[in-house]
Amino acid sequence: MRARRRPRYSEGMAEPPRSNRLGGMALANGLLVHGPGHWAAAVRDEDGRVVVASGRKHLFRAGPLTDLPFARGLVRLGEAFAVLPSVRRGLPQARFAMEDRRAVAGAVAATVVAAIARRRLRWVIAQEAVGAVAGLAPALLTLRGSRSAVWHAVEPKSSAAYESGGADEVANADVHAKEHERCGSNLILPLLVCTTIGNTISRTLFRRRALGARTVVSALSIGAAVEVFSFSARRPEHPLSRLVHGVGHAMQSGFATREPSQSDLLVGRAAMEALLRAEERDGTLTA
């Protein structure tokens, strides 16, 4: 009889209805969360006060395309990133992690490394693999030794609390794990592999001027990565899922997250409560 495999993430976390799943993003000074129809963010400003704002999401209406494999992932990613301008307008105190000077330095370094790889390495796939890994530099430099790692832990702890016990459980986010199976860290491996393969195919089959075709291949690569990410969340016991979550968990526990204080969790709680109030008004979250 095979021993039951120990779960990597919070054991008490039940699978929530899909419409109840919340997304989030660590800010440099707080937390952004979003649900089916709204976003909310809470930050601690320079005076130490918690400032909160919320608003409606811009939903992409693409008809049947919204539910097609590959395309649906791009739509969801687009919706998540589309809230950023709204957050900037609604909460001027918010600071995005990518604004960190280390992220800018990392982006420059990644560009240089990718350029060197294209000149020095013979195989296209090797060039693209090095470029893809180097592309992680901005995120790694932002998280390493910065407050962003704390906020990157507040988001999964708050989400796991809500998914396991509803709105009342958000106050107990401190007892939940800072690693989450739907954290963006679990998208890293699929994204590296899919974009490396996609860019290799694109450079091999299409001319440099075939911008349209190469753009389509790049979009499909990202869509494929999101499909792998979603599959892994649905079937965590599958060998592929274990590999994806193993890499993601190692990143989350190793350097991408750092245990937050109670003061930090209060900011996350403020963001979650603002989001839940907004969604409750529209009835977009089910019991």
Feature roles, as predicted:
Residues 1-287:
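Short amphipathic, positively biased membrane-proximal segments
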